[in-house]
């Protein structure tokens, strides 16, 4: 009886893992149409970015990992902005003051300034754009080629090996 229970649990775990792996596989070179508003009121669209290599760093100001991510985003922007790469930090926080996940434009600009981020801050307040890119955890980074296609899937979460910067640099260097 214990053996049957173990087999059932194991089978259930295998199905769960297979399901998770399926959802995690976002096709590379996928073009995603999107429109995001900056904290300065500009609208940035996928069409307006055509011809640019773009880094979209998704995060939230309340999330400690996003604060860590900002250090890497800042370094990435410093290193690649003069090489034709445009970097944006995309907040997933709501612009609705009634939301538990609320952050005003001013709060987001102050947050970016506090952490030395000198890139445009965009808003994905309903999470629709991050979902289109297959972002399933924060923080995550998506890289777009000059045609607006995703260069590989999203890169995100914890980086215990410290290899994230190398992965991003490798993807960007291939696109340049």
Predicted regions mapped to residue ranges:
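Bacterial N-terminal signal peptides that target proteins for export
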Residues: 2-13
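Bacterial N-terminal signal peptides
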Residues: 11-21
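N-terminal "domain-start" segment that seeds a small globular fold
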Residues: 21-46
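Short active-site neighborhood of thiol/selenol oxidoreductases, capturing the structured segment around
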Residues: 46-67
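Hydrophobic beta-strand anchors of alpha/beta hydrolase catalytic cores
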Residues: 55-56, 87, 141
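Structural micro-motif
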Residues: 116-120, 134-142
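Thiol-/selenol-based redox modules, centered on thioredoxin-like
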Residues: 143-176
């Amino acid at each position: 009886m214990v053996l049957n229970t173990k087999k059932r649990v194991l089978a259930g775990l295998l199905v769960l893992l297979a399901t998770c792996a399926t959802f995690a596989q976002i096709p590379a070179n996928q073009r995603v149409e999107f429109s995001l508003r900056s904290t300065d009121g500009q609208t940035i669209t996928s069409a307006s970015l055509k011809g640019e290599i773009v880094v979209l760093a998704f995060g939230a100001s309340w999330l400690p990992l996003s604060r860590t991510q900002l250090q890497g985003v800042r370094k990435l922007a410093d290193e690649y902005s003069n090489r034709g790469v445009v970097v944006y930090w995309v907040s997933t926080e709501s612009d609705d003051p009634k939301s538990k996940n609320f952050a005003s434009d001013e709060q987001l600009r102050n947050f970016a300034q506090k952490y030395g981020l000198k890139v445009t801050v965009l808003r994905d307040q309903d999470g629709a754009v991050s979902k289109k890119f297959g972002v399933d955890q924060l923080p995550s980074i998506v890289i777009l080629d000059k045609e607006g296609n995703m260069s590989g899937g999203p890169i995100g979460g914890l980086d215990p090996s410290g290899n994230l910067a190398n992965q991003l640099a490798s993807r960007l260097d291939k696109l340049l």
